[in-house]
């Protein structure tokens, strides 16, 4: 039988306006902490830090 996937779907929220703009995959084995990426926020209109939400 196949193993359960280590990848989970997460949502990314803008740290400035708190909108949840992006969803992506994350490997829980390799990235145990919260994921942080600088991405474009359409609400703010510029690139901001997006953090993984629970």
Curated annotation (Swiss-Prot):
Keyword Mitochondrion belongs to the record: no
PROSITE patterns: RIBOSOMAL_L33
GO BP, sorted A to Z: translation
Record's keyword terms, sorted: Ribonucleoprotein, Ribosomal protein
InterPro entries per UniProt: Ribosomal_bL33, Ribosomal_bL33_CS, Ribosomal_bL33_sf, Ribosomal_zn-bd
GO cellular component: cytoplasm; ribonucleoprotein complex; ribosome
Family: Belongs to the bacterial ribosomal protein bL33 family.
The protein's name: Large ribosomal subunit protein bL33
Gene: rpmG
């Amino acid at each position: 039988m196949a193993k359960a996937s280590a990848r989970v779907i997460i949502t990314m929220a803008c740290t400035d306006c708190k909108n949840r703009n992006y969803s992506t995959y994350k490997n829980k084995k390799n990235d145990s902490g919260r994921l942080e990426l600088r991405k474009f926020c359409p609400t703010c209109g510029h690139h901001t830090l997006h953090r993984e939400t629970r």
